[in-house]
């Protein structure tokens, strides 16, 4: 092994294996694109995104870490969400929770 070398496991790595998922339809009602990162509390996204926020409470996008989904103006698309894990406490973002979920 060389310093800094990464040796990946063989086969396919399944993200969020065994986690419950929710699929919702999201529409961007605004006139500007909205981009949402992988670990953003989806419930607290831009108010111009129209979707069932109750289903998104405590959830984040089911995409690889460090990536994002972009919603163009007028665009509708389905996204899959997974629960935030860890302590399940949310602080910051749009300050709509500021505590335990």
Curated annotation (Swiss-Prot):
The keyword Hydrolase is annotated on this UniProt entry: yes
Domain of life: Bacteria
Pfam families on file: Urease_beta
A GO-annotated cellular component: urease complex
Segments forming a coiled coil: none
Kinase among keywords: no
Substrates-to-products reaction catalysed: urea + 2 H2O + H(+) = hydrogencarbonate + 2 NH4(+)
GO molecular function annotations of the record: urease activity
Keywords of this entry: Cytoplasm, Hydrolase
Pathway membership, UniProt: Nitrogen metabolism; urea degradation; CO(2) and NH(3) from urea (urease route): step 1/1
Xref: Gene3D superfamilies: Urease, beta subunit
GO biological process, one term: urea catabolic process
EC id: 3.5.1.5
CDD domains xref list: Urease_beta
Location(s) in or outside the cell: Cytoplasm
Subunit annotation: Heterotrimer of UreA (gamma), UreB (beta) and UreC (alpha) subunits. Three heterotrimers associate to form the active enzyme.
Family: Belongs to the urease beta subunit family.
Designated name of the protein: Urease subunit beta
The organism of origin for this protein: Agrobacterium fabrum (strain C58 / ATCC 33970) (Agrobacterium tumefaciens (strain C58))
Lineage: Bacteria, Pseudomonadati, Pseudomonadota, Alphaproteobacteria, Hyphomicrobiales
Protein encoded by which gene: ureB
């Amino acid at each position: 092994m060389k310093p800094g070398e990464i040796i990946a496991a063989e086969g396919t790595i399944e993200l969020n294996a065994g986690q419950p998922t929710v699929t919702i339809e999201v529409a961007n009602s605004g006139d500007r694109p909205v981009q949402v990162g992988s670990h953003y509390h989806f419930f607290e996204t831009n108010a111009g995104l129209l979707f069932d926020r109750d289903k998104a409470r405590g959830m984040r996008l089911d995409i690889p870490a460090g990536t994002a989904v972009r919603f163009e103006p007028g665009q509708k698309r389905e996204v899959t969400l997974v629960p935030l894990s860890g302590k399940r406490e949310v602080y910051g973002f749009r300050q709509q929770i500021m505590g335990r979920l």
